[in-house]
C-alpha cells in the first residue's frame, strides 16, 4: 500500500515537439494531452489532488531558449521540477509506443529502479490495464535506466505509461477516438 494523496500527470510532447505519429498522421502529443485531461478529471472526481505538467498544446521550456534540442531539454527539466515539487505523490507520464512492425499492441508500464515504489506502481497499473481494458494484453512491466529521464530522476514513485502502439492501425484508431 502506497499512501499518497497527490497525483502528478505528465503529457510529454507539446508545442513544436509532436512525438511520434500514427499511420493516419495523428501526432502523439494530442493523444497524450487528451488522455491526460480525461485522467485528470477522473482522478479529481475520485478524490485525488491532481497536478498536470501541461493542459494545453505547448512546451514548458524556459523563455529565451533557442533551438529545438535545448527547448526539449528545458521542457524535460521543468517537468521533472514539477514532479519533485512535493512528496507523498505518485507520478504518471503518458506516452504512446511505436514499432516498425504494426502487429504489436497493448499498454506497457516502465519504471526506474531509483524508487522502490515505482515498480509496485507499475505492477498495479499494468494489472489494471489487463483486468479492466485489455484482457488479452500479456505485456510485462519493464525497468528502464537514465534514458527515461523523468522516471529515473523523479523523487516520487513514477511510471511511464505507454498506452498503446500508434504503429498498430486498430489501436491507433481506438486511442485517437477514445481520447
Regions found by a protein language model. Give the residues of each.
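Active-site-adjacent mobile loop/cap segments within catalytic or ligand-binding domains
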Residues: 93, 100, 139-179
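A structural motif corresponding to the C-terminal end of an alpha-helix
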Residues: 39-50, 132, 149-156
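Catalytic-core regions of hydrolytic enzymes
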Residues: 1-107, 111-120
Amino acid at each position: 500500500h502506497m499512501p499518497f494523496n497527490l497525483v502528478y500527470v505528465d503529457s510529454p510532447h507539446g508545442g513544436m515537439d509532436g512525438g511520434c505519429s500514427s499511420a493516419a498522421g495523428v501526432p502523439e502529443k494530442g493523444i497524450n494531452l487528451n488522455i491526460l485531461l480525461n485522467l485528470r478529471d477522473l482522478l479529481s472526481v475520485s478524490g485525488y489532488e491532481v497536478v498536470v505538467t501541461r493542459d494545453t498544446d505547448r512546451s514548458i521550456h524556459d523563455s529565451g531558449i533557442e533551438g529545438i534540442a535545448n527547448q526539449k531539454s528545458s521542457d524535460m527539466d521543468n517537468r521533472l521540477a514539477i514532479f519533485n515539487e512535493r512528496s507523498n505523490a505518485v507520478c504518471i507520464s503518458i506516452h504512446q509506443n511505436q514499432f516498425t512492425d504494426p502487429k504489436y499492441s497493448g499498454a506497457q508500464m516502465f519504471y526506474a529502479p531509483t524508487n522502490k515504489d515505482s515498480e509496485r506502481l507499475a505492477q498495479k497499473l499494468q494489472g489494471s490495464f489487463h483486468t479492466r481494458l485489455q484482457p488479452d494484453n500479456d505485456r510485462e512491466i519493464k525497468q528502464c535506466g537514465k534514458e527515461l529521464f523523468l522516471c529515473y530522476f523523479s523523487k516520487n514513485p513514477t511510471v511511464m505509461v505507454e498506452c498503446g502502439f500508434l504503429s498498430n492501425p486498430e489501436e491507433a484508431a481506438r486511442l485517437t477516438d477514445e481520447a
